[in-house]
A protein has these predicted regions:
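Conserved ASCE/P-loop NTPase catalytic core
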Residues: 2-234, 246-257, 261, 265-281, ...
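Peripheral, non-AAA+ core regions of ATP-driven protein-machinery
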Residues: 2-18, 24-29, 54, 59, ...
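A short helix-to-beta-strand connector/capping loop
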Residues: 217, 242, 537-541
Length: 600
């Protein structure tokens, strides 16, 4: 997204009640499609894959390239779509490829003899006509054929494999098969490099019953795999990309422009029509909002046929209707949330029952509610949860103790965020290189491993509170990562984080003062639930967007962080002055007179 688009979003949706507060308007919390009417035109999946279709077409036309590595996530679904697309690209009239193996069986006095002759028709045993075949699971016999010997008569039977059946055409395989049986890849690579099929014994200690002639194979292979599988294959086969072309089936589609939104809508309507379903404009808009929640980007949404079809069928099954509206998709979304919500509800119950202490009212020095995302192994969902972060300060040798890191309960990214917060604070306040205080920072009642730097803005704020002895509002939770210059940057999971804190506040009772602080750069990630939107609309809950630590300090403390004017009213002094005065006071030591020397 270009800077102009980002600035337009901010200008449109920010409501500035004072110079320091930047509360988002409720319209900013859910994205809206710009299309106003539905088109009768339908679009297929490949109409949204201009890069992949061009790469595949060039690969099919290039006679000297026989291998294409194609990144694809939903391989089973994409294999069917890919095979159909390639068939449409192939010429309608195709020649017969391959050979006919003529087997002269042996007897007790002679060995069997096998010869080849050019295939004349598809009736010949190793004839093919340029078919497009796919096999996401294969072994050496299904892929390369087999040589069978009758146990009694010793007659030989040659059985063609997929490489023979796809001669003159295209064979679609999976990278997972190549990785699990790497010897298949080695033999397939040899076939593609030599354009010849050679027979080998399947048993390492037995030879073939007789000589079997090789024959030429005119074969193209497409290997489908996700990014991890392809990366592993590339590590095992260093020459992979000298042998293969590379392209990607894109899992996400940019809908930044109105014509792209229309293309996406036509694609969804085409998918729905396969199941005799129809969608009105509100349904398309709600589906778009749900996809934005998953991608965390209102300009880039998933176009996975598997995922989109699942959402369509879930809404249709639950509503028992053929024409779907926004209500049906919202109902399906809530049902799925409830279905996956056991651990989330238990966590929230612990907070509400004060088994986990999270304050949502009042003010406390050196304590803030950070926003985090919780993931449990064995579950497909994650959810937002407020985390109480506390800080105690003693004037000492400058050590800032990260209790989580010290006890090996935090990862490297968390440690990085902590160090950036310290460096930023020292730089902004012009403190000496050796900080004149010691501090301990704790994620209270956190018993599992934590990682990520999205709490660095919260850590900075709680350090400032403890140093200045200024209380922090407990009704405002915060997320964001900062750099050493104090700029606030984007984090992930913003929708889950906001909804997690909102749920706790809502169940305790909204006061009209509660809210969250998020980075301004995360506005395009927002696609919040209807409950949050309604609360913001009624001014019961607020979402503040900030660009730097100065705006953050203004919201949290209602003070300037640094000196911005010559005079300040009593009780409104800048935070930096309070911290420096406190450090100076603590640093002063009583002077001794020369008489004290004789008294000691």
């Amino acid at each position: 997204m270009c800077d102009n688009t980002a600035n337009l979003i901010k200008a449109r949706y920010v409501v500035t009640s004072t110079s320091s507060e930047q509360a988002l308007n409720w319209q900013a919390l859910q994205p809206e499609l710009s299309i106003t009417e539905l088109s009768a035109e339908k679009a297929d999946f490949w109409s949204l894959q201009k890069h992949a279709t061009k790469a595949i077409s060039l690969f099919l036309k290039q006679p000297r390239r026989s291998l294409l590595v194609l990144k694809a996530d939903d391989q089973a679904e994409y294999a069917d779509l890919l095979a159909e697309f390639i068939r449409q690209e192939q010429p309608k009239e195709r020649s017969v490829f391959g050979v006919n193996y003529v087997v002269e069986q042996g007897d007790s006095f002679s060995f069997p003899r096998i010869d080849t002759e050019p295939a004349q028709s598809l009736a010949d045993n190793f004839a093919a006509q340029g078919d497009v075949l796919k096999a996401l699971h294969a072994d050496q016999f299904s892929l390369f054929g087999s040589v069978r010997v009758h146990p009694s008569s010793q007659d030989i039977l040659l059985t063609p494999g997929l490489v023979h059946q796809a001669n003159g055409g295209v064979l679609i395989l999976s990278a997972a098969t190549m990785l699990s049986q790497f010897d298949l890849w080695q033999r397939l690579k040899h076939i593609l490099q030599t354009q010849t099929f050679d027979w080998y014994s399947a048993h390492p200690f037995k030879t073939l019953p007789c000589d079997i002639p090789s024959y030429p194979l005119n074969l193209k292979v497409v290997i489908l795999g996700n990014r991890t599988e392809i990366a592993t294959l590339g590590e095992l086969e260093e020459d992979l990309y000298s042998l293969a072309d590379y392209a990607e089936i894109e899992s996400y589609y940019s809908v930044a422009q109105p014509n792209a939104q229309e293309n996406w809508a036509n694609y969804v309507l085409a998918l729905a029509s396969k199941y005799e379903l129809d969608l009105d404009l509100t349904a398309l808009n709600k589906l778009y909002q749900l996809l934005v929640r998953e991608s965390e980007d209102r300009f880039l949404i998933s176009i996975s046929p598997l995922k989109t079809t699942e959402m369509l069928l879930n809404a249709a099954t639950l509503s028992q209707k053929q024409t779907l509206s926004a209500v049906d998709f919202e109902q399906a979304f809530k049902q799925k949330n409830e279905q996956h919500g056991f651990l989330r509800e238990r966590t929230y119950a612990d907070i509400l029952n004060e088994q986990i202490y999270v304050e949502t009212n009042g003010e406390i020095v050196g304590q803030i509610n950070g926003l985090s995302v919780i993931e449990y192994p064995g579950t497909p969902v994650c959810f937002g949860e407020p985390s109480r972060i506390s800080c105690l300060v003693q004037f000492g040798d400058g050590e800032v103790v990260d209790v989580e890191r010290k006890n090996e309960l935090a990862g490297n990214l968390h440690g990085k965020g902590m160090m950036i917060s310290e460096a930023c604070l020292a730089s902004i306040l012009e403190l000496p290189s050796q900080l004149p205080f010691s501090a301990s920072l704790v994620f209270e009642q956190s018993y599992g491993e934590i990682d990520g730097d999205s709490a660095s803005l919260a850590i900075f704020s709680v350090l400032v509170s403890a140093l200045s002895d200024l209380p922090l509002p407990q009704n405002i939770a915060i997320t964001g990562t900062i750099d050493q210059f104090g700029l606030v940057h984007a984090v992930g999971g913003v929708n889950d984080k906001i909804e997690g804190f909102f749920t706790i506040c809502q169940r305790r009772g909204l006061t009209g003062k509660q809210g969250v602080i998020i980075p301004a750069t995360t506005i395009q990630q927002l696609s919040l639930s209807d409950e949050v939107v309604e609360a913001v609309k009624n001014e019961q809950f607020f979402i503040y967007q900030v660009e730097d630590i100065y705006q953050t300090a203004k919201i949290l403390f209602d003070r300037d962080l640094l000196e911005e004017k010559e005079e300040y009213a009593k009780g409104k002094e800048p935070i930096a002055r309070l911290i420096q005065n406190r450090i100076a006071f603590r640093s002063e030591t009583p002077k001794k007179s020369w008489l004290d020397f004789f008294k000691s």
